[in-house]
Structure formats: structure tokens, C-alpha cells
């Protein structure tokens, strides 16, 4: 994957527009989770150190395009950046017709989705973005799967279009895990439905040696193998699909599970052998023996890709399976990459972030890359690098 990298460019005195993913949760005007801002800070600092005039843009939430909405304003992000960097970071609302930014200055543009044509990737808007800068830097992996004005269009028209350090690191890590993984490779794919992760399962079945499934996905595989799943969430119409995937790659199945009679925080958890699951049982986690078996598989792996908790870990009594696997990944010498919203929440809960080789910041983009799809914002950077 050949793209120009911001780290290789001379930015002294250049006007640099950086597209970051600063789409963070905000409550009462205050940022409540700063992970994405923290991930973007090194890129912003590096551009400033290189002597650039720095303009940062992002979206936040889903406002009606072309209309200002206070709840989707990036003001809380500007306030956060001002504190984090110890300098005033101005939030600029009117910038499309040009803005004066000096070398060493930093401004944050207001939500790009307030601009008409952003989501449709309108050339007219993209050309206005491009006219603002000498160098456009795409650093928002989380939005790389969307062809929008500030992620794709601007890269077509900017004098120079490059990948930022965060995006470059993400692409390198994903390439390492998927293009030529050290073997044996294990993948953990969990979630409520096979249908939503079918392309991921199919794609991984051709590169990994062990495909560990969890959640509702595992229930469909259990049913495909003829095991009882009680009243658990599963997809009867995808049983044949599960059989076809299991014929291509080793899919180790649970030997024991944690069940309950209801889906609730107060539900009583009972460990049962898989054959003993009753008609009114709901499977909400893998059992301790299964967790130990899966941990053993992870121990002998050289590459691990993790997407999704294997149980309802938000309720502690159904979190042991995810906790054991999280610790096994942390203790493993394998190159490990994790991604997807719930996965990140599990990593936080069990305190293993420092031990995972790479944590992906992109939810949808992470999955689309794993599926083998082309990410438009990356494809345009590759095109520009060739030219």
C-alpha cells in the first residue's frame, strides 16, 4: 500500500489541513470520552513542530447537512484541545472562502457536516477545502470507508495529499495482520448476528487457522453442529452458511456455556455443559472450560485479530469468558490487533490496552478493511501517490 506520508514531508511554512476523527461523545458541552482526541494529538503536535500553519477538521454526530446545530458543534473539542495543548485553539465557523493562518498557528474548523455537499462528496465543496491548504493530511481511519468531501473529495483536488501518522499506523497494523500474518493465526469474531459479520467471517476463514466465534454468532454455529441453544439469540436461516464456513476453517465450539432464564443485569448465571442447555435457557457467555480451551489456542498463536466480546460482559456474571480471553491475548507473544466499539469497551474494562499490539480506532472502517473492501479515502491517497 503506497501512500505519501505526512512524516516524510517538509511542512515548514505550509498550510496543512488535517482531517481527524474527533467524533467524540459530548454531554452538557463537555467531552465524555477523549480516546479519539488523544489518538489525534501526536499528529497535530508533529505538524506544529514541523512549522506548519495547522487547520484541523472533523465531523461530530449526524446533524442535518448544511445547518448549524449547537449539539453537534465542535466547541467542546476546541475547549479540550486548548487545555491539552496549553494554547488557545480557535473554533472557526466561516472558513470555506479562505482563512488567514500563520505558521505555528492552530485552528479547528467547525463540524464539516454543517457544509452542504459534505456527505455527497460534492466537487464544489471539495475544491473549496483543497484551496485552503498546500497539503491535505487524511488521518481519520474511522471515516476512511466513507467517500465524503473532507475524507475523499479534498484529496482529489489538494496540491499534495498524504496519510497522517495515525492512519499510516492503522494501515500498517492491519496489513501485518491480514496480508501476510505470522502463523498460526487466530481470529475472535463475536457479535449478535452472523448476517452482519458474514463478510468478515468469510474473509478471515481464508487467512486464519482458528476462527473463534462468540455471542449470537456462536449460537448459530452451535445450532449448525446440532447442539441445543434454548431460547438464545441465533439465526436459523444461516445455519447452512455456518456449516459452510466451518468446513473451510477450524471453528472451535464451546463445550460449556453460562446461561440465564432472562437477559438482565440481575439474572442468575448458571454454568452448563453444552448438551444440558434447556429450552428456556439463554446462552450469555462461554463457560470456564471453554474459556480455558480458547486461551490455550491463543497462547500458541503468532497473530491474533479480536473483534467483539464473547459474552454479555457489561453484566459481570457473564463477563468471565471475555475477561479470560482478554488476559490471554495480553499475555500472548503474538502480534495482536483489536477493533470494534464493544471490543474497545472490553479492553478498557479489563485493563489490557497496554499489552495489545494495536488497537484500531475505526469501527466500520476496521470491519470493511477486514472484509477486504477498498476504503475510498485510502484508495484516493494511493492514486495521488502514483501520480
Curated annotation (Swiss-Prot):
Keywords from the UniProt entry: ATP-binding, Cytoplasm, Glycolysis, Kinase, Nucleotide-binding, Transferase
GO BP field: gluconeogenesis; glycolytic process
Record flagged with keyword Membrane: no
UniProt keyword Membrane present: no
EC id: 2.7.2.3
GO cellular component terms, A-Z: cytosol
Cellular localization per UniProt: Cytoplasm
Record text on subunit structure and interactions: Monomer.
Family per record: Belongs to the phosphoglycerate kinase family.
Protein name in the entry: Phosphoglycerate kinase
Organism: Pseudomonas putida (strain W619)
Amino acid at each position: 500500500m503506497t501512500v505519501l506520508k505526512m512524516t516524510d514531508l517538509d511542512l515548514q511554512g505550509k498550510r496543512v489541513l488535517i482531517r481527524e476523527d474527533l467524533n467524540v461523545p459530548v454531554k452538557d458541552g463537555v467531552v465524555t470520552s477523549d480516546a479519539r482526541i488523544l489518538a489525534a494529538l501526536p499528529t497535530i503536535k508533529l505538524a506544529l513542530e514541523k512549522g506548519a500553519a495547522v487547520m484541523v477538521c472533523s465531523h461530530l454526530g449526524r446533524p442535518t447537512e448544511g445547518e448549524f446545530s449547537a449539539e453537534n458543534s465542535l466547541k467542546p473539542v476546541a475547549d479540550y484541545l486548548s487545555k491539552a495543548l496549553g494554547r488557545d485553539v480557535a473554533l472557526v465557523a466561516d472558513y470555506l472562502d479562505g482563512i488567514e493562518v500563520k505558521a505555528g498557528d492552530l485552528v479547528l474548523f467547525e463540524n464539516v457536516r454543517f457544509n452542504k455537499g459534505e456527505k455527497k462528496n460534492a466537487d464544489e465543496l471539495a475544491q473549496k477545502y483543497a484551496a485552503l491548504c498546500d497539503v491535505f493530511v487524511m488521518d481519520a481511519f474511522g471515516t476512511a470507508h466513507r467517500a465524503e468531501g473532507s475524507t475523499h473529495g479534498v484529496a482529489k483536488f489538494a496540491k499534495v495529499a498524504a496519510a497522517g501518522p495515525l492512519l499510516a499506523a492503522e494501515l500498517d497494523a492491519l496489513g501485518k495482520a491480514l496480508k501476510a500474518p505470522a502463523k498460526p493465526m487466530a481470529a475472535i469474531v463475536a457479535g449478535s448476528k452472523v448476517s452482519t459479520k458474514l463478510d468478515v467471517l468469510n474473509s478471515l476463514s481464508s487467512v486464519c487457522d482458528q476462527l473463534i466465534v462468540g455471542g449470537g454468532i456462536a449460537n448459530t454455529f452451535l445450532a449448525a453442529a446440532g447442539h441445543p441453544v434454548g431460547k438464545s439469540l441465533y439465526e436459523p436461516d444461516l445455519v447452512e452458511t455456518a456449516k459452510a464456513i466451518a468446513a473451510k476453517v477450524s471453528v472451535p465450539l464451546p463445550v460449556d456455556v453460562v446461561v440465564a432464564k432472562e437477559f438482565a443485569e440481575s439474572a442468575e448465571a448458571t454454568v452448563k455443559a453444552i448438551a444440558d442447555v434447556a429450552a428456556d435457557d439463554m446462552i450469555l457467555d462461554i463457560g470456564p472450560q471453554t474459556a480455558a480451551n480458547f486461551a490455550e489456542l491463543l497462547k500458541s498463536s503468532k497473530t491474533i485479530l479480536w473483534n467483539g466480546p464473547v459474552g454479555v460482559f457489561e453484566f459481570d456474571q457473564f463477563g468471565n469468558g471475555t475477561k479470560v480471553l482478554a488476559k490471554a491475548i495480553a499475555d500472548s507473544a503474538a502480534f495482536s490487533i483489536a477493533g470494534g466499539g464493544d471490543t474497545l469497551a472490553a479492553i478498557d474494562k479489563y485493563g489490557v490496552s497496554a499489552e495489545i499490539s494495536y488497537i484500531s480506532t475505526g469501527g466500520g472502517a476496521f470491519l470493511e478493511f477486514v472484509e477486504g473492501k477498498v476504503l475510498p479515502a485510502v484508495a484516493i491517497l494511493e492514486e495521488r501517490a502514483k501520480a
